[in-house]
UniProtKB/Swiss-Prot annotation:
The keyword Nucleus does not apply. GO terms for cellular component: haptoglobin-hemoglobin complex; hemoglobin complex. Heme b binds at H59, H88. Disulfide bonds: none annotated. InterPro entries: Globin (IPR000971), Globin-like_sf (IPR009050), Globin/Proto (IPR012292), Hemoglobin_a-typ (IPR002338), Hemoglobin_oxygen_transport (IPR050056), Hemoglobin_pi (IPR002339). It comes from Equus caballus. It holds the Pfam family Globin. One of its GO terms (molecular function) is oxygen binding. Keywords: Heme, Iron, Metal-binding, Oxygen transport, Transport. One of its GO terms (biological process) is cellular oxidant detoxification. This is Hemoglobin subunit theta-1. PANTHER family: HEMOGLOBIN FAMILY MEMBER (PTHR11442), HEMOGLOBIN SUBUNIT THETA-1 (PTHR11442:SF15).
Length: 142
């Protein structure tokens, strides 16, 4: 099921507000996930996971690019994210629970940076968006 028009507009407005800093916020969410949920680091043993590491920043930018792609294709997330889903589920064998944990951290980050804008409506729309993204990524796990 696709997001409602109001939710799509709300998510797109947040993305516009984040502007060129989406990578910075995605990196912060990754760092938060690694600190708060250490089990997620098992997929990244080959990276320097210290705060501010260039490798984490590079992966944060990949997350940001994937989420931006999702925002640009809100009407058909499964198709837009199919290559990413295949890589993470089939090749990397990422536990679907890790998507949930990152989703939580991605929700916290804009709330921290935009507290005045983080209304119940924005919160609900972002939860729905992230749930759709997570569902699209984890759909091959079923």
């Amino acid at each position: 099921m696709a997001l409602a028009a109001a939710d799509r507009a709300t998510v797109r407005a947040l993305w516009k507000k984040m502007g060129s800093n989406v990578g910075v916020y995605a990196t912060e969410a990754l760092e938060r996930m690694f600190l708060g949920f250490p089990s997620t680091t098992t997929y990244f043993l080959h990276l320097d996971l210290s705060l501010g590491s260039t490798q984490v920043k590079a992966h944060g930018q990949k997350v940001a690019d994937a989420l931006t792609l999702a925002v640009e294709h809100l009407e058909d997330l499964p198709r837009a994210l199919s290559a990413l889903r295949h890589r993470h589920v089939r090749e990397l064998r990422v536990d679907p629970a890790s998507f949930q944990l990152l989703g939580h951290c991605l929700l916290v980050t804009p709330a921290r940076h935009f507290p005045g804008d983080f209304s119940p409506t924005l919160h609900a729309s972002l939860v729905k968006f992230l749930s759709h993204v997570i569902s699209a990524l984890a759909s091959d796990c079923r």
